[in-house]
Amino acid sequence: MSRVSQARNLGKYFLLIDNMLVVLGFFVVFPLISIRFVDQMGWAAVMVGIALGLRQFIQQGLGIFGGAIADRFGAKPMIVTGMLMRAAGFATMGIAHEPWLLWFSCLLSGLGGTLFDPPRSALVVKLIRPQQRCRFFSLLMMQDSAGAVIGALLGSWLLQYDFRLVCATGAVLFVLCAAFNAWLLPAWKLSTVRTPVREGMTRVMRDKRFVTYVLTLAGYYMLAVQVMLMLPIMVNDVAGAPSAVKWMYAIEACLSLTLLYPIARWSEKHFRLEHRLMAGLLIMSLSMMPVGMVSGLQQLFTLICLFYIGSIIAEPARETLSALLADARARGSYMGFSRLGLAIGGAIGYIGGGWLFDLGKSAHQPELPWMMLGIIGIFTFLALGWQFSQKRATRRLLERDA
């Protein structure tokens, strides 16, 4: 086996272990933020939405800067520093009793993510061959789902005792992850050339095809981020107990572990990437619309199942498209900018979703935020369809990934 092949094989295992630690650390804390501050402390949902939206916007919106710096200096220092900042953010969150302190903790957490997320994504593109990426992204999503359930179960159990224990556990996991990267991650370059920070950013901004694709996905992310805000609140309201939230993540894990990889393998042989992305988005949008009208937990979990199935179809295709469009000369910059849609959509989804949720509750129209999200998803579906229908874009970008 050549040294390059050996590095790729070892790199796959490293990426999987690293991803599991990151997912566990994240999901121990973040799914419970809305329960802690809205349900237990009585804050308005929009206050928590601002905190979550701030973290999302900082982490993803500044991702191009983190990616460009990683292109220049390498992945390792950025990843280790970012994970330690995330740990500091979680530690601060544990003592948050005022909105400004929660916002500050989410700011720290987001800045940490800005540093470690783009180089981690670029490492996947660097180490995984193009024809294997869709399947590897599917494996990562399966791992994400399993880690989300384990993390949410652990966090829910710890929340019975003290929210500070929840945050401390998340912080410790990110410190361990930082140590793991500091010890084992080689000093790999992310790009084929050592691209100056400004040049990498300029290269991305001039790529209008990539910029259009990324910005269009903002609507997709407005729906996707509700698994952290409105869906847990809705499950808690219908069930009458925060412990039911863990079953929402258990559903995601069961569906992902049983369906994600088979669907990815089958669909890559029969459908283009853009068709899979659009089909998943349409299912997500339609499943959102009736959520505010259900009164039973069984009905709610059925709609959540449909939402997750849509995500299972769409997410590997979205990740693979982003990697396919990235210029090898500035991988970090491209993967950083690819998060801008998540930054915009996530911030609007969290803040706007929290505001609409409060508005719908006060106006006795609980279906309002869910119908609006469904409409946004359908408009995004139409926008993607228009974008991918352009002959030039289709010919240049969207080959089958099999």
UniProtKB/Swiss-Prot annotation:
User: Periplasmic topology: which positions?
Assistant: 34-98, 160-164, 235-243, 298-299, 361-367
The alphabetical list of record keywords is: Cell inner membrane, Cell membrane, Membrane, Transmembrane, Transmembrane helix, Transport
Principal subcellular localisation of the protein: membrane
Topological domains (Cytoplasmic): residue ranges?
1-12, 117-138, 186-213, 265-276, 321-339, 389-402
- Disulfide pairs here are none
Q: Where does the sequence pass through the membrane? A: 13-33, 99-116, 139-159, 165-185, 214-234, 244-264, 277-297, 300-320, 340-360, 368-388
What cellular-component terms does GO give this entry? plasma membrane
PROSITE patterns the record matches: MFS
Q: Known InterPro entries for this protein?
A: MFS (IPR011701), MFS_dom (IPR020846), MFS_trans_sf (IPR036259), MFS_Transporters (IPR050171), Multidrug-R_MdtH (IPR022855)
Q: Give the Gene Ontology MF terms in alphabetical order.
A: transmembrane transporter activity
Indicate how the chain sits in the lipid bilayer: Multi-pass membrane protein
Q: What protein family is recorded?
A: Belongs to the major facilitator superfamily. DHA1 family. MdtH (TC 2.A.1.2.21) subfamily.
Q: What NCBIfam families does this protein map onto?
A: PRK11646.1 (NF008650)
* The protein's name in its UniProt record: Multidrug resistance protein MdtH
